[in-house]
Regions:
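Short, basic/aromatic-enriched C-terminal tail that caps enzymatic domains
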Residues: 121-134
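Alpha-helix capping/helix-boundary segments
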Residues: 9, 41, 84, 105, ...
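Active-site neighborhoods of divalent-metal-dependent phosphate/nucleic-acid chemistry enzymes
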Residues: 72-119
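Residue-level signal for well-ordered alpha-helical positions
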Residues: 16-17, 48-51, 91, 129-130
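Conserved beta-strand segments of alpha/beta enzyme cores
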Residues: 34, 76, 115, 129-131
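Short, well-structured N-terminal submotif of metal-dependent ribonuclease cores
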Residues: 1-37, 53-66, 112, 126
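A secondary-structure boundary/capping signal
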Residues: 6, 38-41, 81, 119
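Phosphate/NTP-binding elements of NTP-utilizing enzymes
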Residues: 45
Length: 134
């Protein structure tokens, strides 16, 4: 299964795996699954780290974190393509969930045929045309 890791899942997997649910941990550890992190998440971590958002302050410098995850866990990097951005027009816009990072990750998962691994209640609360797992 191709798993697109939501930003917080990527951070937890890399630095605090004890925060992952048992299911999420098992999915990340399963060698049959392909783990993918989006450039969107890397961008989100960088921005929120600079803003001092506690949940995105990573102990390891971001470039080293990405390098180590690619080497140790074979995490692939997903670039942002125009098809991902154009897929946003087909997503419903919910007043309680307008996060542009989340919306682009959802669009990427749809276009790439990936399952989005996220613990974000807002994503699970709404009906998006994507497979979401916790």
């Amino acid at each position: 299964m191709k798993l697109l890791l939501d930003t917080h899942i990527f951070v937890w997997w890399a630095e605090e795996p004890e925060k992952l649910s048992r299911r999420a941990l098992a999915l990340c550890q399963d060698p049959d699954n392909t783990l993918v992190v989006s450039v969107v998440s890397i961008w989100e971590i960088q921005i929120k780290h600079q803003l001092g958002k506690a949940e995105y302050v990573v102990a390891t410098p971001l470039n080293e974190l990405i390098k180590s995850q690619r080497e140790q866990n074979d995490v692939a990097i997903l670039p942002v393509e125009s098809t991902h951005v154009l897929a946003l027009q087909n997503l419903p816009m919910y007043p309680t969930h307008k996060d542009p990072f989340d919306r682009l990750l959802i669009a990427q998962a749809i276009v790439e045929g990936a399952t989005l691994l996220s613990a974000d209640d807002k994503m699970h609360k709404h009906s998006y045309p994507v497979t979401l797992l916790r």
